[in-house]
Amino acid sequence: MKKGDLRRQAILDTAEALFFERGYEETSVQDILDAMELSKGGFYHHFESKMAVLEAVSARRAER
């Protein structure tokens, strides 16, 4: 797996955990960034929005 793919998966893992813990509405992109010590640019390189992350988390869970 490429470094970018690993970063994308890490964002999804972190977001999924925060969505479960706090709920989607109560989780901000900044919360995800803070939990990962990730820059906004690093986040937006992989996802265009928090909704895009939710869609990717949902798709990944549907594949399991």
Predicted stretch roles:
Residues 25, 44, 63:
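Nucleotide phosphate-binding site architecture
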Residues 30:
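Residues within the helices of the helix-turn-helix
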Residues 3-5, 24-25:
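Short, flexible segments with low predicted structural confidence
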Residues 6, 10-17, 21, 35, ...:
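Alpha-helical structural segments
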Residues 36-47:
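Short hydrophobic/aromatic patch on the recognition helix
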Residues 18-27, 47:
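Short helix/strand-capping hinge loops at secondary-structure junctions
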